[in-house]
């Protein structure tokens, strides 16, 4: 059995609405919500986006993959 790179990689998901609100002078949220998860590189070659709960926005928002 050939051994190569592991297709599963660890990725960090960051709330997209917190990032937008944090850029303004009036900061509505005290922080940025981040989740750590894994994705299969073969099945999902592009950026991963999941709808997760953001404790700073108090609602479900889209969390996008960020680079390390």
UniProtKB/Swiss-Prot annotation:
<dbReference type="GO" id="GO:0009507">
    <property type="term" value="C:chloroplast"/>
</dbReference>
<keyword id="KW-0689">Ribosomal protein</keyword>
<dbReference type="InterPro" id="IPR038584">
    <property type="entry name" value="Ribosomal_bL33_sf"/>
</dbReference>
<dbReference type="Pfam" id="PF00471">
    <property type="entry name" value="Ribosomal_L33"/>
</dbReference>
<dbReference type="InterPro" id="IPR018264">
    <property type="entry name" value="Ribosomal_bL33_CS"/>
</dbReference>
<dbReference type="InterPro" id="IPR011332">
    <property type="entry name" value="Ribosomal_zn-bd"/>
</dbReference>
<keyword id="KW-0687">Ribonucleoprotein</keyword>
<keyword id="KW-0934">Plastid</keyword>
<dbReference type="GO" id="GO:0003735">
    <property type="term" value="F:structural constituent of ribosome"/>
</dbReference>
<dbReference type="GO" id="GO:1990904">
    <property type="term" value="C:ribonucleoprotein complex"/>
</dbReference>
<dbReference type="InterPro" id="IPR001705">
    <property type="entry name" value="Ribosomal_bL33"/>
</dbReference>
<protein>
    <recommendedName>
        <fullName>Large ribosomal subunit protein bL33c</fullName>
    </recommendedName>
</protein>
<keyword id="KW-0150">Chloroplast</keyword>
<comment type="similarity">
    <text>Belongs to the bacterial ribosomal protein bL33 family.</text>
</comment>
<dbReference type="GO" id="GO:0005840">
    <property type="term" value="C:ribosome"/>
</dbReference>
<dbReference type="GO" id="GO:0006412">
    <property type="term" value="P:translation"/>
</dbReference>
